[in-house]
A protein has these predicted regions:
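Conserved small/polar residues in nucleotide/adenosyl-binding loops
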Residues: 255-256
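A conserved mid-protein helix/loop that constitutes part of the nucleotide-sugar donor-binding site
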Residues: 181-195
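Short His-centered aromatic/hydrophobic patch
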Residues: 75-80
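A short, histidine- and acid-enriched strand-loop-helix "catalytic/donor-clamping" loop
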Residues: 48, 95-111
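A short, active-site helix/loop in glycosyltransferases that binds the activated sugar's phosphate group
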Residues: 125-149, 156-161
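Membrane-proximal helix-turn-helix segments that form the acceptor-binding/catalytic region
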Residues: 64-68, 108-127
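Acidic anion/phosphate-binding donor-loop and adjacent secondary structure
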Residues: 139, 156-173, 184-187
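Nucleotide-activated donor-binding/catalytic signature segment of Leloir-type glycosyltransferases, i.e.
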Residues: 204, 213-248
């Protein structure tokens, strides 16, 4: 079996880094394991675009013009694949589409948007989700039958982190750290740490989607014990090193 492996970040480069324990395998969504099962990957040539539309147009062109044969389109997200999925729903794209869906499917109060959404999901042949709760909530929308949804236990690449710790034998963990950018409740986190003298290092992107974390953070008068570091791009190895030097990881999710 040959798949077209679509990822929303650099793939081939990250895969090579994974081989040298410089990139955690779980961010590659199974790519390091595929060869073991006789699955060959045609890797998407990723490019970053500030515009969602430009990303969709680029991804559509790359996929439709791909000269290497493949049987299945496998996406770690549907971001950028929207036009291909609509073509599949229309019967104009013939390859099965399998994607990771990172949230539960939702219903819209707007009738036109809801109709488009229901048609859109007809173009996805199979979806992987992270929990039974996400599957249950998705089924409640009626947009996908149960046989299309599959629970996959996604977790950290332990070999990557074990190897990292072996390279830091003299580390002395101290303080708190928080990393990441998706649905982070920085309001609650900063309120809590501003009320203590505990040391916190926060590594976060200035913005993520419609959320401007920098604006939220700048409303606070932060004590010296709370340090904010704005990140750019995907830097899992660097952040893993930072985390390994801390006593505790803090993550407070923002309600959807």
């Amino acid at each position: 079996l040959t798949i077209y492996f679509y990822h929303t970040r650099l793939t081939r480069e990250s895969y090579e880094e994974w081989k040298d324990y410089k990139f955690p395998g779980h961010i590659l969504y199974g790519l390091p394991l595929l060869e073991k099962y006789g699955i060959r990957s045609v890797m998407h040539k990723y490019k970053a675009f500030p515009s969602r539309l430009k990303l969709m147009l680029y991804a559509t062109k790359e996929i439709l013009c791909c000269k290497e044969p493949y049987e299945v389109l496998y996406g770690t997200s549907f971001r950028g694949l929207e036009l291909i999925i609509l073509l599949r729903a229309l019967g104009l794209y013939r390859k099965p589409i399998v994607i990771w869906h990172h949230t539960a499917l939702k219903t819209s109060s707007r009738k036109i948007r809801e109709r488009i959404s229901r048609f859109f999901y007809k173009g996805i042949d199979h979806m992987f989700l992270f929990s039974k709760k996400l599957i249950k909530d998705s089924l409640a929308t009626g947009k996908a039958p149960e046989e299309k949804l599959q629970l996959i236990h996604w977790g950290p690449d332990l070999a990557f982190y074990d190897h990292l710790l072996q390279t830091m034998p003299d580390r002395k963990p101290e303080g708190f750290i928080s990393t990441g950018k998706e649905n982070r409740d920085v309001d609650t986190m900063l309120q809590a740490f501003c009320a203590t003298d505990q040391q916190l290092d926060l590594y976060i992107a200035p913005t993520n989607g419609s959320v401007n974390y920098q604006q939220i953070i700048e409303r606070f008068c932060l004590p010296d014990s709370v340090r904010v570091h704005y990140t750019d791009g995907v830097i899992p190895y660097l952040l893993a090193q930072k985390v390994a030097r801390k006593s505790c990881v803090v993550k407070i999710g923002r309600a959807h």
